[in-house]
Amino acid sequence: MEKKGQNPDTDIPMVGKSPCVRITGITAEMNLTLVTEFFLIAFTEYPEWALPLFLLFLFMYLITLLGNLGMIILIRLDHRLHIPMYFLLSHLSFMDICYSSVTVPQMLAMLLEHGAALSYTRCAIQFFLFTFFGSIDCYLLALMAYDRYLAVCQPLLYVTIMTQQTRLSLVTGAYVAGLFSALVRTVSAFTLSFCGANEIDFIFCDLPPLLKLACGESYTQEVVIVVFAIFVIPASMVVILVSYLFIIVAIVRMPSAGSRAKTFSTCTSHLTAVSLFFGTLIFMYLRGNSGQSSEKNQVVSVLYTGVIPMLNPLIYSLRNKEVKEALRKFLNRVKLS
């Protein structure tokens, strides 16, 4: 007699909405159902909100693409923006486009289809790309803080230190470090065994929901993941905090209030972006597992994958006279042509 949920020919059981593989050990107690496909179910419990959320996230994604691409083009076209800070900002804008594009299009498809099935390989690729681009984002924000430190605390040496070769080396180092960290964490995460339920109540394949599906011995992989994660978020935060500590000390020592206000204004945009980005990452990844709700995690994930990449061009342009002036001249040229 055939068992419900099994294919009589292949004897492959069905778990959730995906095929799984049954591995038979020496004894019956060692039987495991290993997940070979994941099913994303974020927001599916509210089907009436699917269309409004789809339109909202689509609008946010388009603004993200236009805003960050516009920032890259503006920096490329205006020679006054060919300085280290804007060189780093152009790479940050590019990373924001990539970072958002890894998750948001799939989230849009998930809302339309009331869920999304991902193969094991697709899930691993998405996790790798998200980790890669996110790590580079962290490193670039740290480099921008270091750039501000040099500009404020070492103004006479700034031009000598931040040469074109130095800028390229720093950015290349950020890309290489992000690649290495992403590779190690992805390999560590996907050498875990995932068994039982295959539903991920999240908007993409991220580490916290994946670890909930892990079974068997996972201590070694989790230690490796945590160790390499320390070299991304906490390490970047240390560079940022130390840089701004020196900046604050330098500002306090300035003789006039006008000088202090002018100098601090050059850092406000970056401080705002750092606070938003790292604030959401800390809430998501560096807090304990107790008391976490999937609804809160989904909202926070939308913030750092969709909202913050959309806001960054606004943050760096609204309080920045050089960017606003470059944008005004660009628009005037467009009108005249």
Region spans (language model):
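Transmembrane helical core of 7TM receptor-like proteins
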Residues: 1-337
